[in-house]
Amino acid sequence: MALKLIHKEFLELARDPQPHCSAGPVWDDMLHWQATITRPNDSSYLGGVFFLKFPSDYLFKPPKIKFTNGIYHQR
């Protein structure tokens, strides 16, 4: 079930890419994705690379996200 949903979401991203970011599976593992924020230039997340690991029961449980660079937080 999770793979079917993730594949559907991947096809939607390919069909209608979102501005200022990219995302997709790492190699052929649909449960492991990499996402990158490319703009806007004044964003504290510019150039951010994120890895997402989807659980096999995705939709009922959220993906785990790993940030490879610092994340701005106001506190």
Swiss-Prot record:
SUPFAM superfamilies, per the entry: UBC-like
Domain UBC core as annotated: residue spans: 1-75
InterPro entries found in the cross-reference section: UBQ-conjugat_E2_core, UBQ-conjugating_enzyme/RWD
Transmembrane parts of this sequence: none
Domain of life: Eukaryota
Pfam hit, one: UQ_con
Family: Belongs to the ubiquitin-conjugating enzyme family.
Alphabetized PANTHER family for the sequence: UBIQUITIN-CONJUGATING ENZYME E2
Protein name: Putative ubiquitin-conjugating enzyme E2 D2-like protein
